């Protein structure tokens, strides 16, 4: 996983939030801590909010907070919310005209889809609270 990916940012942020789940954090505070731009943070956290992992409040005392207890947020929840696939499935490729290439593409695509399913299953076995060691 790339250190600057949206997934890394989301997991890092949620892990910190799990340490004090009732605390509200601003995009600017999160961005400063993560060493990135607040706009990037808002985009990533917006996806997590859409997935029901975070809530947000506007205004002077506003910010972001966990929508669930940390034990109820798995790494798979975060991964799926961001729609940032680690395993490229090859589903977007054109159908090759060569029958050998077509069969090869189909089989490799099936293997990659199996890997993706296994990855999501394994990510689902670990919660954000476990990442923190709490």
Language model: regions and residue ranges:
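Short alpha-helical segments that sit at the start of domains
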Residues: 1-13
């Amino acid at each position: 996983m790339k250190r600057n990916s949206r997934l890394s940012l989301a997991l890092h942020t949620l892990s910190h939030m799990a340490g004090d789940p009732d605390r509200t954090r601003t995009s600017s505070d999160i961005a400063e801590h993560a060493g990135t731009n607040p706009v990037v943070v808002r985009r990533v956290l917006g996806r997590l909010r859409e997935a029901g992992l975070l809530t947000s409040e506007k205004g002077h005392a506003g910010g972001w907070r966990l929508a669930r207890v940390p034990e109820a947020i798995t790494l798979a929840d975060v991964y799926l919310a961001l729609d940032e696939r680690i395993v490229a499935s090859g589903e977007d490729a054109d159908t090759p005209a060569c029958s050998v290439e077509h069969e090869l593409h189909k089989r490799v695509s099936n293997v990659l889809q199996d890997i993706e399913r296994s990855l999501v299953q394994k990510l689902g076995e670990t919660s954000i609270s476990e990442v923190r060691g709490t």
